[in-house]
């Protein structure tokens, strides 16, 4: 059976330093409607920003629906499609027995995703996917703005 998505989320994250000031962005499409979400964090990593973009996009949904999340992050896609169930059943431990990195965000994604309604799609970074390119630019600008804001306050 082919599943038709109601909502398309394209997400990306950026970090200046890793760790350092970071930004995230999400483009949500529903029919002809588009909404842009973005933000920044003072000290973070690129992976946390990728995950935050997906969290904020899913959190902004107002009803249950089929969702396609497009990301250039294999870390995010594989975490959600290959590792999450195992991590959860292992008490949030990795295969090596160590605590899963970014557990707090994985748990938020787990709660928001409702695994039967979210499809995770990987596209190559800077591969010409229009929404992904736009999210990349917005996430980078959010990271830069966060860095400027920090400089103004410190």
State each model region's role:
Residues 1-48, 52, 56-66, 137, ...:
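RNase H-like nuclease fold core
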Residues 8-21, 55-138, 143:
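RNase H catalytic domain
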């Amino acid at each position: 059976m082919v599943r038709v998505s109601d909502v398309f989320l394209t997400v990306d994250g950026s970090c200046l330093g890793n760790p350092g000031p970071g930004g995230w962005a999400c483009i949500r499409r529903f029919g002809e409607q588009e909404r842009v979400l973005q933000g920044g964090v003072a000290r973070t990593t690129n992976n946390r920003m990728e995950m935050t973009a997906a969290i904020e996009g899913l959190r902004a949904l107002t009803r249950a629906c089929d969702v396609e999340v497009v990301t250039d992050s294999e870390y995010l896609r594989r975490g959600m499609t290959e590792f999450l169930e195992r991590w959860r059943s292992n008490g949030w431990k990795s295969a090596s027995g160590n605590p899963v990195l970014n557990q707090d965000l994985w748990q938020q994604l787990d709660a928001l995703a409702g695994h039967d309604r979210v499809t995770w799609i990987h596209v190559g970074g800077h591969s010409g996917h229009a929404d992904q390119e736009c999210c990349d630019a917005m996430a980078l600008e959010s990271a830069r703005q966060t860095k400027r804001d920090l400089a103004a306050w410190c």
